[in-house]
């Protein structure tokens, strides 16, 4: 099959899809905040919805709106919860330490290939610091106990998602805590994204800004930025 490609410039306005990475983090911060948050998010996907559903299981009231989400923080943290992560590694790795910090007896449900994805060394560090983790079935993971204050350490060369989960968790623990990241840090920009989201909510106090918008996904926007460099006029 022969294809003919004719160069052409583009003009117009483009709405970039929202950053899934930031959406996860802002939903979590909003669920931990002191008052409701209007989260503007032009689009969603199954991973983001998994995080929202897990936060609902932890007591937050999250309402999908035409423009995004309205997040009402949990009035009371439940003693136990079932959290369906679907196939989202971010959801599992972010919320597992949070559940440990809150002292919730949590059962995480997993689908697809998520049960095969690694949790070490996060698993070992959480057990060292007070939690008990077990796999009752091939598709579920149980977390019980409560993380205690103290000095935490994690190998940064495995996954930045472990670090994000611990940053959230340690901000919730009463008492002096610290986190040492050893080795070469993997995907450092994602850690900075977590710190920026927490700063927007003034963590560890988690004061809601009221309204916030999920920024566009830069990896998706790169195509259009490249087009502008080649003569297109897109905004």
Model regions and ranges:
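Structural preference for solvent-exposed beta-strand-turn elements
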Residues: 1-235
């Amino acid at each position: 099959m022969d294809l003919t490609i004719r160069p052409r410039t583009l003009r117009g306005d483009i709405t970039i899809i929202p950053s899934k990475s930031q959406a996860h983090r802002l939903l979590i911060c909003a669920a931990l905040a002191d008052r409701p948050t209007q989260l503007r998010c032009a689009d969603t996907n199954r991973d983001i919805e998994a995080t929202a559903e897990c936060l609902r299981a932890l007591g937050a009231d999250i309402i999908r709106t035409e423009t995004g989400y309205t997040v009402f923080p949990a009035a009371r943290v439940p003693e136990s919860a079932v959290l369906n992560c679907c196939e989202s590694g971010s959801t599992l790795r972010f919320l597992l330490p949070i559940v440990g910090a809150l002292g919730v007896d949590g059962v995480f449900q997993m689908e697809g290939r998520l049960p095969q994805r690694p949790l070490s060394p996060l698993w070992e560090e959480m057990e060292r610091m007070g939690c008990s983790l077990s796999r009752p079935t091939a598709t579920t993971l149980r977390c019980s106990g409560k993380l205690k204050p103290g000095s935490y350490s994690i190998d940064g060369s495995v996954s930045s998602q472990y670090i994000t989960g611990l940053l959230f968790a340690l901000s919730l623990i009463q008492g002096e805590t610290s986190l040492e990241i050893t080795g070469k840090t993997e995907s450092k920009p994602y850690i900075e994204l977590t710190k920026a989201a927490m700063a927007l909510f003034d963590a560890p106090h988690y004061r809601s800004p009221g309204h916030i918008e999920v920024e566009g996904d830069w990896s998706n926007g790169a195509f259009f930025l490249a087009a502008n460099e080649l003569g297109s006029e897109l905004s």
